[in-house]
């Protein structure tokens, strides 16, 4: 059987064996597995199927396609891809809303703070390009559900918006494949409209909070000497997230334009 190490994975030491993926989660993954089984029972084709699971490993179905890593290709920077990721996220969010008994599971989100409000869905928690499988500009699947958990829709979409609108500012935009900044306000509006019923202001404010709290979380783990975060220490991810939060906060009013609520 053909084996292919998936070298870009940070934590689960994943490798492909034919049409399956073998992963070794570092924490109890019973919640995400139950969620994936719920998606399968609902007929969802956007998420991997759980084929085998134990405390030490899990075997999932492989979703063929291409994941996105910076610099993103022209296809993944397109409006078509932006619309597709918004609609795919809406589909899984709607299906997750009917997942009963989530209180029985321990979830492992990466962030240390959340906005005020009751959870609306079981979100993915890390909707970045490298966790989304594409066929051209269309989303073929959403993978790596280890950071899933109860949250609001805008909280999950905030990180997706950061990566796909994108909210990267300054010199950082070129490393993500952009020769010049796109019309972020228009792309944010397109993302929210394609998802349906999503408030751009909530998405931006949640993104600022998410980026800062992620940076704080990473800094705490790095300072604690957690070996799982050695790559993040070497690449200074904590500084990157906190700087991104500060830049986005300064750019907030420009991005949103006149206050739509008239305040």
Regions picked out by a protein language model, each given a short descriptive name:
Residues 157-196, 211-222:
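Active-site activation/catalytic loop segments of kinase-like enzymes and analogous catalytic loops
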Residues 1-4:
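Conserved N-terminal boundary motif of the eukaryotic protein kinase catalytic domain
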Residues 12-16, 50, 112-156, 166-168:
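Active-site acidic catalytic loop and adjacent metal/ATP-binding pocket
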Residues 52-56, 101-112:
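Short, glycine/charge-rich beta-strand/loop segments that flank catalytic centers
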């Amino acid at each position: 059987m053909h084996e292919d190490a998936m070298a870009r994975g940070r934590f689960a030491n994943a490798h492909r064996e034919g049409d399956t993926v073998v992963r070794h989660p570092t924490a109890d993954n019973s919640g995400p597995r139950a969620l994936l089984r719920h998606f399968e029972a609902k007929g969802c084709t956007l998420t991997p199927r759980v084929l085998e699971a134990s405390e030490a490993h899990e075997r999932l179905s492989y979703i063929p396609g291409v994941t996105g890593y910076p610099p993103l290709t022209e296809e993944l920077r397109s409006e078509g891809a932006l619309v597709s990721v918004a609609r795919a996220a809406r589909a899984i969010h709607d299906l997750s809303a009917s997942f009963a008994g989530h209180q029985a599971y321990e979830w492992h989100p990466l962030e240390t703070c959340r906005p005020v409000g009751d959870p609306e869905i079981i979100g993915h928690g890390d909707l970045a390009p490298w966790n989304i499988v594409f066929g051209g500009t269309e989303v073929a699947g959403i993978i790596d559900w280890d950071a899933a958990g109860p949250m609001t829709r805008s909280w999950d979409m905030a990180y997706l918006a950061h990566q796909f609108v994108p909210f990267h500012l300054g010199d950082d935009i070129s490393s993500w494949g952009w020769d010049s900044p796109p019309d972020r306000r228009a792309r944010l509006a397109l993302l929210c409209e394609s998802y349906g019923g999503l408030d751009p202001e909530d998405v931006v404010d949640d993104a600022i909070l998410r980026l800062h709290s992620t940076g704080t979380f990473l800094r705490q783990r790095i300072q604690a000497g957690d070996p799982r975060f050695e790559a993040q220490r070497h690449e200074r991810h904590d500084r990157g997230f906190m700087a991104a939060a500060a830049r986005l906060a300064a750019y907030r009013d420009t991005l949103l334009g006149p206050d739509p609520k008239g305040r």
